[in-house]
Regions:
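Mid-chain, well-packed structural core segment of small domains
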Residues: 67-89
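Core segments of cupin and vicinal oxygen chelate
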Residues: 2-6, 12-51, 55-57, 84-87, ...
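Short, acidic, Ser/Thr-enriched surface-loop or helix-capping motifs
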Residues: 109
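Short beta->alpha transition motifs characteristic of CBS
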Residues: 99-100, 117-121
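A short, acidic/glycine-rich surface segment
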Residues: 58-64
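Short secondary-structure boundary/capping segments
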Residues: 42-43, 64-67
């Protein structure tokens, strides 16, 4: 094992509206939003980790699974019951994407970034 140089501070996600996308993920993860509408940097905290959202007005979101506009990252979000979780994320503005398997389903957040709901199959 190598020695630690530093610790992960946050995962930063680009969005045309940082506060709106932060609120989307905070609602899914049961976390708190630190920032206000119109801020160009908004943080979501809780559960021992943080996500940050930075305004990127010219963001060209990925178009899963199009290789010409591939994902830059994706989050795997563990859920206890996929059939209960899916309608909730859809109601928050997610949309279902092609793909998935016996223990995950693929979605896009309101900006177009893919994320997966995963569960123990």
């Amino acid at each position: 094992m190598t020695s630690m140089i530093g610790q992960l501070h946050s995962v930063v996600i680009d969005a045309p509206d940082a506060h709106a996308l932060a609120t989307f993920y905070a609602n899914i993860l049961g976390m708190d939003v630190k920032g206000s509408p119109g801020d160009d940097w908004v943080v979501v905290t809780g559960a021992g980790y943080r996500l940050a959202f930075q305004e990127a007005p010219d963001l060209q979101p990925p178009d899963w699974p199009d290789p010409d506009r591939p994902q830059q990252f994706h989050l795997d979000i563990r859920v206890a019951d996929i059939d209960e979780a899916e309608p909730k994320v859809l109601a928050l503005g997610a949309r279902r994407l092609p793909g998935g398997g016996g223990d995950f389903r693929v979605f896009a957040d309101p900006v177009g970034h893919p994320f997966c709901l995963v569960w123990d199959a």
